Amino acid sequence: MVVVFENKAEQEVLGSPDAPYLTSLSASGARFTEFRAVAHPSQPNYLALFSGSTQGVTDDSCPQLLGGRPNLAQRLMSAGCTFVGHSEDMPTAGFTGCTDSTGRYARKHNPWVDFANVPASSNLPFTDFPRICPGCRRSPSSFRAFAT
């Protein structure tokens, strides 16, 4: 599981009464507190984290259509694992728009949507995470990520 905090300091989230589940997860995992951006603005960093490369993307424009290029989800699925990405403020499962009607969701934080070799069924709202993810504790063949 990878949890990405953007625009919030770690201490604003972990230990917060509004984030008990994330706080409980942090106690049993590795924390990469020195991870730094490879580019600015946001989107190239999410692509680099997810695929090992910025894919030549230098801005937050939408959509990026990156076809079947190698990425974390594709590699996990090729190894018999599962991948599900959860995105904060995404309005519905499988949503591929650039933003929602409120302007709170931004696809630039959701890199798996840009790759044709990641199934649309892997793209879920953050609100589904607490309901679905408890099973990932028991299953070593599951990987879940979400962006904030």
Language model features with spans:
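N-terminal pro-sequences and low-complexity stem/linker regions of secreted or lumenal proteins
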Residues: 1-148
